[in-house]
């Protein structure tokens, strides 16, 4: 390869990445997922468009695995362990039982539609059987979904790859050897995938955490150390026949939920790397496909995609979540709809090509077509479905910027900056009147270009910039303190006519609003009553009905209900309440 060829590759690669980034601005305007746009850029630049010929499946496999490892590491870093209390076991059920059911139902339909053997059909089902972490993390971000739904989908997408890889590799081996029966040894292999992946991921994450916190390096080297360590854990786990995808996700989970040096620097770097990984991966996959090869299979492939989306996925979710009573029907319906397919099925579809199986190109084209339909249909309609099924909650107002204050190695102190607009509730209030969360401090107050020296009597004005020192767990309380009037109105429309303290006694609530206890202990706290009625771990947005009124969890403090909204039937709104 001469210098001219190398420079041409650099130029083409840079132009494709830049074009993907620039065109992605159309995503919000058109309501199309950004991943579809990036995929389209690759297809347009490929053999049927710009004429770039790329058919190196081994390179695509390499790029895909590298990109997914980075994306899962970033996803694990941003997943809070606290979300496991409501979603760990449901998500694992979806990641195992759910993938198996989806594989069988989709595979049987594929065998019938394309006149294939049952094993060949099941291979197609296994290839498209798992949801995709890149698609889920990308499309769920900032949608304001309740914690139970978000955590279930994210943990499922981060942990269901071992099952899909296991089924795909097993079925490829059966087709290559002519084997038609299953044996118990396969179950042991599956347990090995999960077991080794979990052990290496958690153990390797702990070792990497100790390295980051104990070694003094230049600030810019810590993110690189984390990425290198995560990739090493991914590769080592794969080398000893564990699930590298699960391991790197758990590694990120350990790092993201313990005090770690240069936390914000690591997160910022990983955010950029995860975006680059997604862009590179979907560009390569777009280049790899030949669009005109999809046309002959378009109608049966569309039928298979719709069968998977409308039948196989909903049935797998219904069975997978059957033991978990805390999930409402609308939450199950939304989880069923957000069975997003992305890069993982396309990468798994490369396996049969590399193994030289008959019909391997058909498997690849089918996987690509199903991913395209999933992203266009499910990804585009995600915000609309969330509102229709009422699984969204009002978001907490966020600061306009935040920065780490690394006063010691594992410092978790941060600086939050809030801009006070005309609609803020605190305008005109003196600083001493603000009920700041315990442990937070106002560090600075800017008015225009001037840094003020505030006292307790200083009043807040429109346009002020308020700098507050605190921790991440203070953000909900600070958000309420510096919220806007429209946001408060949204809170009350969502949570009800009044918002009560969670420790209010039922007897007092019943007397205040004229409700009947019907044998319920009057000394029971309202929060405990909601938990009993809800039959599971509560999250913000959970609702129960009592005495014809709707009671909604409004604020959580860890796993404890702090405030509860109450909505009365139209025209029967009585008495006072305690507002947020």
UniProtKB/Swiss-Prot annotation:
The keyword NADP does not apply. InterPro entries: Cation/H_exchanger_TM, FAD-bd_PCMH-like_sf, FAD-bd_PCMH_sub2, Na+/solute_symporter_sf, NhaP2, RCK_C, RCK_C_sf, Transptr-assoc_dom. It catalyses: K(+)(in) + H(+)(out) = K(+)(out) + H(+)(in). It holds the Pfam family Na_H_Exchanger. Its main location: membrane. It is found in: Cell inner membrane. GO terms for cellular component: plasma membrane. One of its GO terms (biological process) is cell volume homeostasis. It is a multi-pass membrane protein. Residues 402-484 form the RCK C-terminal domain. Gene3D superfamilies: 1.20.1530.20, 3.30.465.10, Regulator of K+ conductance, C-terminal domain. The chain crosses the membrane at residues 6-26, 34-54, 57-77, 86-106, 108-128, 162-182, 189-209, 217-237, 240-260, 279-299, 302-322, 334-354, 366-386. Signal peptide: none annotated. It comes from the Bacteria. The keyword Phosphoprotein does not apply. Keywords: Antiport, Cell inner membrane, Cell membrane, Ion transport, Membrane, Potassium, Potassium transport, Transmembrane, Transmembrane helix, Transport. GO terms for molecular function: flavin adenine dinucleotide binding; potassium:proton antiporter activity. PROSITE patterns: RCK_C. HAMAP family: NhaP2. Belongs to the monovalent cation:proton antiporter 1 (CPA1) transporter (TC 2.A.36) family. NhaP2 subfamily. K(+)/H(+) antiporter that extrudes potassium in exchange for external protons and maintains the internal concentration of potassium under toxic levels. This is K(+)/H(+) antiporter NhaP2. The gene is nhaP2.
